[in-house]
Amino acid sequence: ETAAVGLRDRGVHFTRDPERPEGGRSEAKRGFVAAPDNVRVAVIESGWRGVDADFGSDADQVASAEPYVVPRTPWGTPDLQGMWSGNKAHGIPLERPDDLADVAELTPEEAAARRERGTLGSIWGYEREWRDTTLGYVKSAPSRQVAMIIDPPDGRIPPLTEEAQERQRNARQSFGDYVRRRPAGPEDLSAYVRCISRGLPGMMMPSIYNNGLQISQSPGFVAIQKEMIHETRVVPTAEREPLGAGIKQWLGDPQGRWEGDTLVVETTGFNGRTNYRGSSENMKLTERYTRLGPNRLEYEFKVEDPTVWTSSWTGRFEFELDNEQYELVEYACHEGNYGMTNILSGARARDREEAAAAAETGSGAQ
């Protein structure tokens, strides 16, 4: 209280007074103050240990006699707009683990432990209190979903085709040459490392941070922007002619349509320079966005690539609405990163050394 009074005397405005929040892991208090650029800053008391999320039923999931009615835009289509977060889905594995083959749903304790392992394994030595307050995980209970893949029923990616297996064997054999080969240019690093694209459906997947998903709509179009790499897809919902067969794009050529309250997006025409689990430029991705409640958005994706897998496979997880706090700020990726500079300058230095040595050897032979 004394510290709060001192802050107020210096003109600091508390948007939420210091208090012990519900679910606090200690008796320490937390308050929020207004900062420049519409940023809200948490001010915490010494001894703060974060907040345990409520594992009880979401308000959206409480049984009701009245079914949820999806809101409409002024032009009459389902309204999916808002700032959605994939934090709740962080930690869900793509494939079903072998030891959970017959498990329908994790217990709350198992879900919390899974998120803890994944998060701590990703952020190394950061203090837990900063992890809790900066990554946003205190705002959502971990998902109890066992795995993302719902089809095939075993929750596993189907086997590779013979053609794909052959490509995989060749790739393993040539990997040693790739490692030994001297870097020639930026293209020796992947598009993801260079912050160009994660491709699809990788763009949509939750990670340890940057899980924001902003959806905007206008008549005939839906724009989907992901926080990680700030990739934006503009999806037409009115039927149109597809791009020519010779035009390939990082995120493909999408075509959307409405099926009741669900946005369905079919995408083809990938350039093959990114892949997800080995997918190729021949992949067809079918996505379904369905609002299940005021704060719940179900995302389902079906992957078809007959040149890679023997059958299609489908995954599903949810996003949560967070218009109150979440904001997509400027995305910084390689500012101040000297990795690529060192890789290429080192390779060129080796080129010069070898050229000089060869010239000296030739001169000596004469």
Regions found by a protein language model. Give the residues of each.
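PEST-like low-complexity, intrinsically disordered acidic/proline/serine-rich tracts
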Residues: A53, D58-Q366
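Vicinal oxygen chelate
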Residues: V5-D58
